[in-house]
Amino acid sequence: MFKKRNLKWLSILATVIMAWVQLGGALVTKTGSENGCGASWPLCHGALLPQNLPIATIIELSHRATSALSLIVVLWLVITAWKNIGYIKEVKPLCIISVAFLLIQALVGAAAVLWQQNDYVLALHFGISLISFSSVFVLTLIIFDVDQKYEANKVHIDRKLRIYTWTMAICLYVGIYTGALVRHTKSSLAYGSWPLPFNDLIPHTEQDWVQLAHRTLALIASISVFLAFNYAIKHYQNNRTIRYGYTAALLLIILQIVTGALSIFTHVNLIIALLHALIITFEFGLIAYLIVLLLRSQRVEKVKQNAY
């Protein structure tokens, strides 16, 4: 059960399920299915499977079932990885983060159902689960020996690129929080047309302010990704890991902008809205991997300095 040969398929399964949890959470919010099971948790309307199953209940119940399954699969992956490849420096911290944030996510979700948290607290739910997904995603890349295939274990990342990468990660995470807040406050179509309602730029409602904040932070995050990409391409032309990684980050953020604009133009088409959530999930997972490389590079540098 916890054999090394199970690691690859198990890591793919865990990544897919965690991505599905992200999508499920977005679907619950987009369809207004948060109260699909009433104020009852972990049961649904006081039962394991309620007799009356309207669409809101089915969506909420499916999300809870997927979240429970993800906890089982991630725990299985974590135990297997810890046992078989725990000697790799990043594996144990990633295992701990994966499970810890998955549990925190479940508790925040339960609190939202039982005590009806306000929108600003509920928006944290997506960001917390995103950290858990990213940990599983990075663990999967390590399991598939991406480090060896692209010489990622030999990458030296200079101080400037580190600053660009951390700035990119922070801006993106704050932008993701405001995006979740847009969903929870039902502000998707607030503040007029995209990119700006030039005939009336002043926000008038809380929803307008939330939407404007999201667009502003999305712009800042996009600029930070472009600056990191520009520096990486100029100074790391011969390094495949850096070149591919930062190029992928730029392409994903462009797709994110496109789907964000299309969400408004299509009056929040459900498929486009879910695609918007999925793209940012993998974007943050990729940036998490770049941060792991950054920390590894820093660690190697310190070892070399201590050797002298």
Swiss-Prot record:
Subcellular compartments: Cell membrane
Entry cofactors: heme b
Binding site for heme o: H63, H125
Transmembrane segments: 9-29, 68-88, 94-114, 124-144, 162-182, 216-236, 245-265, 271-291
Catalytic residue list: E60
GO cellular component terms given for this protein: plasma membrane
Pathway(s): Porphyrin-containing compound metabolism; heme A biosynthesis; heme A from heme O: step 1/1
Chain sites annotated for binding heme b: H214, H276
GO molecular function: metal ion binding; oxidoreductase activity, acting on NAD(P)H, heme protein as acceptor
Stretches of the chain found on the membrane's Cytoplasmic side: 1-8, 89-93, 145-161, 237-244, 292-308
EC numbers for this chain: 1.17.99.9
Class of enzymatic activity (EC top level): oxidoreductase
GO biological process terms on file: heme A biosynthetic process
Membrane topology, from the record: Multi-pass membrane protein
Catalysed reactions, as listed in the record: Fe(II)-heme o + 2 A + H2O = Fe(II)-heme a + 2 AH2
Extracellular side: 30-67, 115-123, 183-215, 266-270
InterPro entries linked to this entry: COX15/CtaA_fam, COX15/CtaA_HemeA_synthase, HemeA_Synthase_type1
Record remark on domains: The N-half (TM1-TM4) and C-half (TM5-TM8) domains are connected by an intracellular loop. Each domain is formed from four-helix bundles and they align in a pseudo twofold symmetry manner. The N-half domain is the substrate-heme O binding domain and the C-half domain is the cofactor heme B binding domain. The cysteines of disulfide bond Cys-37 and Cys-44 may be involved in transfer of reducing equivalents from quinol in the membrane to the active site of the enzyme.
Function, in words: Catalyzes the conversion of heme O to heme A by two successive hydroxylations of the methyl group at C8. The first hydroxylation forms heme I, the second hydroxylation results in an unstable dihydroxymethyl group, which spontaneously dehydrates, resulting in the formyl group of heme A.
Description of how the protein assembles with itself and partners: Interacts with CtaB.
Protein name: Heme A synthase
Organism the protein comes from: Staphylococcus carnosus (strain TM300)
Organism lineage string: Bacteria, Bacillati, Bacillota, Bacilli, Bacillales
Gene field: ctaA
